Amino acid sequence: MDSWKFVHVCDTQPGSPRSFRYRPAWLENQQTAYSQIKRLQPELVLVGGDLTRDGTLHDFELEEAKRNLDALEIPYYAVPGNMDVGNKFTLLQSPTPNDDLSANVTSANLERFARVFGAFPWSFVHRNVRFSGCYAAVAGSGL
């Protein structure tokens, strides 16, 4: 059997110079990671969310994240993270930031992500290995 490689990457959260929370080091970290991925020459890349810093606020961050992944010139499959589409789904506001209703994942944010990165959840077979990706925060939410 031939050997082959794939990469799983997540939480790069680079932000954007156009966003209010931008820090240049975040983008530099992502660029370093993507440079290392290109050197590894994997057959595919799995992206496990948090491709953006403020993707729930700025469409341009989702679009920049896609351009950066496209530049790898390696097939990739992405699922969102809370920074991309919203946090866990909660029904009640609480005094702690952990249950902030305004940070809930929404169907609109899920649809925005899918328009940029494609449908999810996804599942496919590559070299007799099944890969599946989903966004667990929507479990039990009805979304």
Predicted regions and their residues:
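Extended active-site neighborhood of metal-dependent phosphoesterases/phosphodiesterases
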Residues: 57-143
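N-terminal active-site segment of His-dependent metallophosphoesterases
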Residues: 1-59
